């Protein structure tokens, strides 16, 4: 069984912001693969189903980004997920917009959601990094990641391709997955 965690912040004011790309992608996976609606469990939303014979749980922590590790640890421990079967989807300001990278383990690169998860479960889990780039204005990174996508029409097809092809990543075929996205 795999746990796919989409990082983001709860609340309508954060919908469609760069920092909420994890929520956006998890919602797209849920829709594409016909999962049931999310249900609230303490400080997160979860749903589960099967994708190509792989049992999957989708999760959206509702504790705000900087405290994501607490609900992730709670769900991981309760359902006994191996770190090899945990995938965290998050925004990455160090990648150009629309670029994705898959990585296992490593540091947080200053991402507070990853810092929280690392401190709660360690850092040897899979990450699907979604490039959002950086603002070309004088705006701070914190203000930028909490702003709405300026290029949503470009982002939605990419999000849909990720959802359609996530089964390749679940099978460990990261190269085919990445190639199907670009």
Swiss-Prot record:
Site positions (Discriminates between blocked and unblocked aminoacyl-tRNA): 9
Site (Stabilizes the basic form of H active site to accept a proton): 91
Entry's Gene Ontology cellular component terms: cytoplasm
EC number: 3.1.1.29
Keywords annotated in UniProt: Cytoplasm, Hydrolase, RNA-binding, tRNA-binding
Pfam families reported for this sequence: Pept_tRNA_hydro
Catalytic activity: an N-acyl-L-alpha-aminoacyl-tRNA + H2O = an N-acyl-L-amino acid + a tRNA + H(+)
Protein name: Peptidyl-tRNA hydrolase
UniProt organism field: Wolbachia sp. subsp. Brugia malayi (strain TRS)
Gene that this polypeptide is encoded by: pth
């Amino acid at each position: 069984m795999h746990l796919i965690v989409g990082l983001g912040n709860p609340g309508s004011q954060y919908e469609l912001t760069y920092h909420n790309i994890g929520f956006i992608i998890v919602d797209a996976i849920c829709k594409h693969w016909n999962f049931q609606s999310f249900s609230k469990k303490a400080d997160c939303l979860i749903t589960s189903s099967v994708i190509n014979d792989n049992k999957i749980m989708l999760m959206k922590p509702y504790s705000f980004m900087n405290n994501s590790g607490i609900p992730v640890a709670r769900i991981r421990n309760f359902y006994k997920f191996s770190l090899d079967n945990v995938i965290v989807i998050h925004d990455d300001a160090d990648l150009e917009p629309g670029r994705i990278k898959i990585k296992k383990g490593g540091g947080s690169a200053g991402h507070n959601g990853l810092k929280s998860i690392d401190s709660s479960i360690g850092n040897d889990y899979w990450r699907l990094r979604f490039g959002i780039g950086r603002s070309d204005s004088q705006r701070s990174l914190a203000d930028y990641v909490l702003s709405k996508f300026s290029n949503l029409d470009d982002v939605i097809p990419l999000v849909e391709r990720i959802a359609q092809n996530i089964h390749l990543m679940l099978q460990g075929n990261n190269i085919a997955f990445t190639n199907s996205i670009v």
